[in-house]
């Protein structure tokens, strides 16, 4: 693979690998809580603390394929840097959601809502990239620079709660 190709996906790969480490952390928390309750064997039922850890992990796992799909689509079809930034923000929010879910369930709500907004942003970046492709294909008009400028400008607004 040549350097230019790697340069176009390296940030997305870094965010993906960080998300894998985060998934490992969540799985470790579930395993630790399970062993605390049941000794050596893994059980899907247990105390309230285990149920919360297990449910928080399961909710994060359920949203993970969607996150990866829109992260890579937005990064490849639109712009890598804002997509990677949004991906890092999503991982931070997912951590906040996970930790918040272990406490009071109302503490997880801000992370959940913020995560939905980031997924929507990545989805819209992907749609803009696809739309630009078809504009080039059918009309010969390339709006890639405008789309990259807009997405780069809007991505810091994801920090606003």
UniProtKB/Swiss-Prot annotation:
Changing residue 123 to A: Decreased affinity for the inhibitor MK-591. It is found in: Nucleus membrane; Endoplasmic reticulum membrane. Pfam families: MAPEG. Changing residue 112 to A: Strongly decreased affinity for the inhibitor MK-591. PANTHER family: ARACHIDONATE 5-LIPOXYGENASE-ACTIVATING PROTEIN, MICROSOMAL GLUTATHIONE S-TRANSFERASE. Keywords: Endoplasmic reticulum, Leukotriene biosynthesis, Membrane, Nucleus, Transmembrane, Transmembrane helix. Residues 1-8, 78-80, 129-161 are lumenal. GO terms for cellular component: endoplasmic reticulum; endoplasmic reticulum membrane; membrane; nuclear envelope; nuclear membrane. The chain crosses the membrane at residues 9-30, 53-77, 81-102, 116-128. Homotrimer. Interacts with LTC4S and ALOX5. It comes from the Eukaryota. It is linked to Ischemic stroke: A stroke is an acute neurologic event leading to death of neural tissue of the brain and resulting in loss of motor, sensory and/or cognitive function. Ischemic strokes, resulting from vascular occlusion, is considered to be a highly complex disease consisting of a group of heterogeneous disorders with multiple genetic and environmental risk factors. Genetic variations in ALOX5AP may be associated with susceptibility to myocardial infarction. Involvement in myocardial infarction is however unclear: according to some authors, a 4-SNP haplotype in ALOX5AP confers risk of myocardial infarction, while according to other ALOX5AP is not implicated in this condition. One of its GO terms (biological process) is leukotriene production involved in inflammatory response. Gene3D superfamilies: Membrane associated eicosanoid/glutathione metabolism-like domain. The keyword Endoplasmic reticulum applies. This is Arachidonate 5-lipoxygenase-activating protein. One of its GO terms (molecular function) is glutathione transferase activity. It is a multi-pass membrane protein. Required for leukotriene biosynthesis by ALOX5 (5-lipoxygenase). Anchors ALOX5 to the membrane. Binds arachidonic acid, and could play an essential role in the transfer of arachidonic acid to ALOX5. Binds to MK-886, a compound that blocks the biosynthesis of leukotrienes. The C-terminal part after residue 140 is mostly unstructured. Residues 31-52, 103-107 are cytoplasmic. Residues 108-115 dip into the membrane without crossing it. Belongs to the MAPEG family. The gene is ALOX5AP. Its main location: nucleus.
């Amino acid at each position: 693979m040549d350097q230019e190709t790697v340069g176009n996906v390296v940030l997305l790969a870094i965010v993906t690998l960080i998300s894998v480490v985060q998934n490992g952390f969540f799985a470790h928390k579930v395993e630790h809580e399970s062993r605390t309750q049941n000794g050596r064997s893994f059980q899907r039922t247990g105390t309230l603390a285990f149920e919360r850890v297990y449910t928080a992990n399961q909710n994060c796992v359920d949203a993970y394929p969607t996150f990866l799909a829109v992260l890579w689509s937005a990064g490849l079809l639109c712009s890598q840097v804002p997509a990677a930034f949004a991906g890092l923000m999503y991982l931070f929010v997912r951590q906040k959601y996970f930790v918040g879910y272990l406490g009071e369930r109302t503490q997880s709500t801000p992370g959940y809502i913020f995560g939905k907004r980031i997924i929507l942003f990545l989805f819209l970046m992907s749609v803009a990239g696809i739309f630009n492709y078809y504009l080039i294909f059918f009309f010969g008009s390339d709006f890639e620079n405008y789309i990259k400028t807009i997405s780069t400008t809007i991505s810091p607004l994801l920090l606003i709660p």
